[in-house]
Design a protein with these regions (language model features):
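A short secondary-structure junction signal
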Residues: 126-131
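Conserved catalytic core of two-metal-ion nucleotidyltransferases
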Residues: 1-20, 65-124, 143-146, 154-231, ...
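General alpha-helical segment detector with a strong preference for membrane-spanning helices
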Residues: 35, 52-54, 119, 217
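Active-site nucleotide-donor binding segment shared across nucleotidyl transfer reactions
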Residues: 16-49, 58-59, 201, 228
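A surface-exposed partner-binding patch
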Residues: 34, 41, 47, 54-59, ...
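Short, basic, helix/turn surface patches
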Residues: 52-62, 265-267
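The substrate-binding groove and active-site-proximal loops of carbohydrate-active enzymes
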Residues: 1-7, 45-52
């Protein structure tokens, strides 16, 4: 694994330790599950780690996980970092810097991270789909766009759509289903709707796998999971598709992200970025 992957792997190991202490069900998902099954570790060109927990376990991790993690790890979500506007949580390494290109002007924690995603038991019906689309629109208003005109529109709309209120209302809606007998898990972090829902039996109790020499848990019906997610997951990708999907503005595995923040008299704190990008090889 490369140096970035090594830092992410260390975070994963601490995450697993906390899950074991709290007796929480977790799964490696998405490319991390594919990596465990196909490569016994990272997909060689992958640049992130994704893990998921059923919502009840996710909420317990959010509530109790921080105090069980090393002091240099920060459990980031919209409640612990007011400028973080994503549905999932992250564990970030405060000793490092990883500023993604689309977040370079956002004053939030910018350490190297892994994603922690809740799996929600929810009905697959028209009314819920409408509510979900409304939530996504509200969320996107608070995220940067490549196009300048979209950012101007979003800037005008933001005061009328406070993200903390949106998250609070939607989370209450999600929580009311967490104890009900439903058959579908929903991964809201996945933007591709055809992969949004999967039967919870596909995840099941999980099965053991090896990831870079570490025992991990992946979905129980892993072949079915990966087939639904990637179609022919055993096939080799063309060389031009062998690339990560995160684009960084600054990557520094030896200095904390706070070294890249400066104070200004008019705008409070803002990101101060180096002109060159550091290699992760």
């Amino acid at each position: 694994m490369n140096e970035l992957q090594r830092v992410q792997f260390e975070i994963l190991c601490e995450f697993i330790t906390v899950c074991k202490k709290l007796d929480l069900q977790y799964y490696l998902i998405c490319g991390s599950a594919l990596g465990a099954e196909k490569y016994k570790g990272f997909i060689p060109w992958d640049d992130d780690i994704d893990v998921a927990l059923p919502r009840s376990d996710y909420l317990r991790f959010i509530e109790e996980g921080q105090k069980l993690l090393p002091d240099y790890y920060f459990l980031q979500n919209c409640k612990t970092d007011k400028n973080y506007h994503h549905f999932c949580s992250k564990i970030r390494d405060s000793r490092t810097t990883y500023v993604e290109s689309d977040q370079k002007n956002i004053n939030m924690h910018h350490g190297v991270f892994i994603d922690i995603i809740p799996l929600d038991l929810l009905p697959d019906d028209k009314h819920f789909s409408i509510k979900y689309r409304f939530f996504r629109i509200c969320q996107l208003i608070h995220l940067k766009s490549p196009e300048t005109y979209k950012n101007i529109i979003k800037f005008v709309l933001r005061p009328f759509v406070p993200i903390s209120v949106v998250y609070s209302v939607f989370e209450k809606y999600l929580n009311k289903y967490s104890s009900k007998t439903l058959s579908e898990y929903c991964n809201f972090h996945n933007a591709k709707n055809n992969r949004l829902y999967m039967h919870k039996d596909i995840y099941g109790k999980g099965i053991n796998a090896v990831f870079e020499g570490k025992d991990v848990v992946i979905p129980e019906r892993i072949d079915e999971y990966l087939t639904l997610y990637y179609d022919d997951w055993r096939a080799e990708l063309p060389e031009e598709q062998k690339a990560g999907h995160h684009y960084y503005e600054v990557l520094d595995l030896e200095r904390p992200y706070t070294d890249y923040i400066e104070k200004t008299t008019h705008n409070g704190r803002r990101m101060k970025l180096r002109k060159t990008k550091k290699s992760i090889g």
